[in-house]
Amino acid sequence: GLPSLGGEVSPDGTEFWGWEPLAWNDDFTIPYADPNSDQLPTSNDFDRDGDGKPDSWPTGWYNVDLEEYVWPGALRQGSSNSDLEIFFVTDDRTNREFEYYPFPGDSSRKGLGLEIEFRYYQWANPLAEDIIFLIYKVTNKSENDLHEVTFGMWGDPHIGGPSNWQDDLSYFDRNINMVYAWDEDGISDVAGRSPGYFGYKFLESPGQPYDGIDNDNDGMVDESRRNGIGDDGIPTAGDPFDPRQPGEPNFEWTDLDESDMVGLTGFASPPFTSQNRISNDHYVWENHLLAGEFDSANVDQAGDYIFIYSSGPMSLPAGEARRFSIALLVGQDYEDLTLNAITAQDIYEKNYQFAKPPDKPIVMAVPGNEQVTLYWDAEAETSYDLISESYDFEGYVIYRSIEPSFLDQQTITDANGSRFLFEPLKMATAAP
């Protein structure tokens, strides 16, 4: 990947003025990360140094009752919603650029007083293999209400590779809340490999529960995760007197779309110049985060452009949180990208409860005379699927490739002609 060049530092160059990771919550009772590790915590990490703990996890994730380290899942402890999850928390206390003090009792803690919890999800399932889900929970930890907040993302896509930045095109689709980019000449940094399409889709934009408007046109005004109202507009979800007994399965903070979402409200794609870097925050705010403005100039004129897409403005009172979820998408062409966007929306609306394969076995290869013998354990055969509530192992599939990413074996296509599945060398049905 490309290192970031847009972050802001103090005039003496000794401190980042922006978002920095946290190892603990404010009162040091909830661990977020291992301060001795330079890795983000991942759900499938291993214990490489032999201390009994996955290397990127903090020691505070040890559960004394279970006598094991437990992943802090969003919906259940000890389990991730996805095949791979990354979790971390940051805040903006080191942003000392402006004379604003969000914590009157602590003048050293600057920024806006915001904290962000990040969760990134990815599945190995072929339906979702071209999607990464980015979930952000933004909390106003300060003592001040924030009255005009816009949430968004700044990015610099290079479609075709790090050196292939001169001929990018970009556009947006408000109907599906997606912005996207592609390469004009279809030539990448890798000889013989054509670049595809890249996009971001708003699955969940922050909610505005105080304006008296039904922002997402779902029939409920000022919907939020804090008001006790269920998906039918009546505060009875999960209660024994709910006529839909046993009630709504996901409720309040466990229901991802239970908010009055305002949607994608702006998209700018200006040239990558020093003026438009994210460190020039005042200029970016005044010129590129304007609600209702959508830049369409770059659909025909190729160049080196950045992405700035946004949702807002809205209020963020002290102590409250807003959540937004984004799908990072890739596709062979625009049609494939759009199909992936629809798949992402479907997974999101199911609260990320998506089909998962059995756990992977540990495989050992033993070389022989013009042959290799493979041995593996029974981990896959005994894994339990929480979605189907069953042991759903069906068999083993072996793939063989001379290409590191196995792309030469991804020859099975879907109905649209997009490469979809790998062709196995050997299949064996071996249910326990």
Q: Which positions does each model-derived feature cover?
A:
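Extracellular/surface-associated beta-sandwich interaction domains
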Residues: 1-432
